[in-house]
Curated annotation (Swiss-Prot):
Name the record gives this protein: Glycogen synthase
Residues reported to bind ADP-alpha-D-glucose: K15
NCBIfam families (alphabetical): glgA (TIGR02095), PRK00654.1-2 (NF001899)
GO molecular function, one term: alpha-1,4-glucan glucosyltransferase (UDP-glucose donor) activity
Pathway connected to this protein: Glycan biosynthesis; glycogen biosynthesis
Length: 480
């Protein structure tokens, strides 16, 4: 089976978040199931710099008013189709924002162009290769099924994955003519959304199947609390909505072989983690003692619950814990966490930028990782924690709820607990979880058992890929 995957970012070429990890890992995980994937991605400067010896596959002289070329290249085991369109993607900032952190004003055109290019490939314009199915990801490629619906193309099934429904790609109605869609596409059944153009909304309406990245999130987005205004549209498609938990690359996140950590180890040699712990202590300027180190590796945003973390930081220190925080985001939240570090020197350390090697070292050296998200479609950080023996302390929501077994009495008795869940997502809720963690940490036998149980968890892409392959086969066999 041939699948075209379309995404605005893919690891290892370009990454701003978990979307890139998922879209990069899935094609490799699907290979054993006979799925051949080509992944279409914008030709950002970082992408163009990273690829070697690309082959020109298709010229698009008028892609929404600009010239573009589709290049093909193999990189890190993935077959990439790179949309080389300098007018859209050759920018000095990031994939979505300029150097000052503001959205590019033409983001609607940049990602409509990506979607239209995907629809052109779906229609068979790429010489010698035509997909059996198209898989789009988030709002940036959600117009792929829209263009497939409204342009006269051969009928192909399409899948749209909602990685985070909070990001919807909503723009003023004045951009509609620039999309070059027929007039009737601007309707309730199409991309019209309360008088605006809704990229994600249009994709939800037109894709043949919808997936989210965990079963709990699939249920949550049917409710007003989590549906972000789109719960009605999703409910109308609920019969074709599937929650499939993400996996992680178990080779990259393998503490026995990880080149990014100071000392490798396994579930049988957990004492070796002490060397990694010492490096974390040095890097974050923490005091060296026997108390637990709680880490945070996250965007510093309200969604991720970082305001709650800032509120409880002093109390965690007074309990005897230490905090190592890695990430950047909202300026006010960054300021609050840096202020906590200033008040509690040696007990709270903050590094205000993401650093992939450091994130590996933190998971390999810290005792637990705090993930107090208000909503979390799937989450990957807790899976990295399981793999590394860094116990996740998570809000009971979305994929966090699906992947972590809470250390309640029954789970501890059965020796199946892998972390701590808490609700509600408030400062007091998090504090109660931290108190439980401090109590459990005192019994090193129980703590070690939980570490080993987490490290045994199957967090690879195996079962998830099997479910995606089954969904693909079902859609292709019944036709669009």
């Amino acid at each position: 089976m041939k699948v075209l995957s379309v995404s605005s970012e893919v690891f290892p070429l370009i990454k701003t978040g978990g979307l890139a990890d998922v879209v990069g890992a899935l094609p490799i995980a699907l290979k054993p199931y006979g799925v051949e994937t080509k992944t279409l991605i914008p030709g950002y400067p970082a992408v163009m710099k990273a690829i070697r010896d690309p082959v020109v596959r298709l010229e698009l002289p008028d892609l929404l008013g600009e010239a573009a070329t589709i290049l093909e290249v193999e990189h890190a085991g993935i077959s990439f189709l790179v949309l080389d369109a300098p007018a859209y993607y050759s920018r000095t900032g990031g994939p979505y924002v300029d150097a000052t952190g503001k959205d590019y004003p033409d983001n609607w055109r940049r990602f409509a162009a990506l979607s239209l290019a995907g629809a052109e490939i779906a229609a068979g314009l790429l010489p010698g290769w035509r997909p059996d199915l198209v898989h789009a990801h988030d709002w940036q490629s959600a117009l792929v099924p829209v263009y497939m619906r409204y342009y006269p193309t051969p009928e192909l099934p399409s899948v749209l994955t909602i990685h985070n429904i909070a990001f919807q790609g909503q723009f003023g109605a004045d951009i509609f003519p620039g999309l070059r869609l027929p007039a009737h596409a601007f309707s309730v059944e199409g991309i019209e959304y309360y008088g605006d153009v809704g990229f994600l909304k249009g994709g939800l309406q037109t894709a043949h199947a919808l997936t989210t990245v965990s079963p709990s999130y699939a249920e949550e987005i049917l409710t007003p609390e989590f549906g972000m205004g789109l719960e009605g549209v999703i409910a109308s498609k609920a019969y074709n909505l599937y929650g499939i938990v993400n996996g992680i690359d178990a080779d990259i996140w393998n503490p026995a072989t990880d080149p990014m950590i100071a000392q490798t180890y396994s579930a049988a040699t957990l004492k070796e983690r002490a060397i990694n712990r010492h490096r974390v202590v040095e890097h974050f300027g923490l005091e060296e003692d026997d108390g637990p180190i709680f880490c945070v590796v996250s965007r510093l945003t309200w969604q991720k619950g970082m305001d709650i973390l800032a509120e409880v930081a002093s109390e965690v220190v007074h309990m005897g814990g230490k905090l190592a925080i890695l990430g950047a985001g909202d300026a006010a939240l960054e300021g609050a966490l840096f202020a906590a570090a200033g008040r509690h020197r040696g007990r709270v350390g903050v590094v205000g930028r993401h650093n992939e090697p450091m994130s590996h070292l933190m998971q390999a050296g810290c005792d637990a990782i705090i993930i107090p998200s208000r909503f979390e479609p799937c989450g990957l950080t807790q899976l990295y924690g399981l793999r590394s023996g860094c116990l996740p302390i998570v809000a009971r929501t979305g994929g966090l709820n699906d992947t972590i077994i809470d250390a309640n009495h029954a789970a501890l008795q059965a020796k199946v607990a892998t972390g701590i869940q808490f609700s509600p997502v408030t400062a007091e809720g998090l504090l109660q979880a931290m108190r439980r963690a401090m109590h459990l940490f005192q019994d090193r036998k129980v703590w070690t058992q939980m570490q080993k149980q987490g490290m045994k968890s199957d967090v690879s892409w195996g079962r998830s890929a099997e479910r995606y392959a089954a969904l693909y086969s079902s859609l292709v066999s019944r036709g669009a």
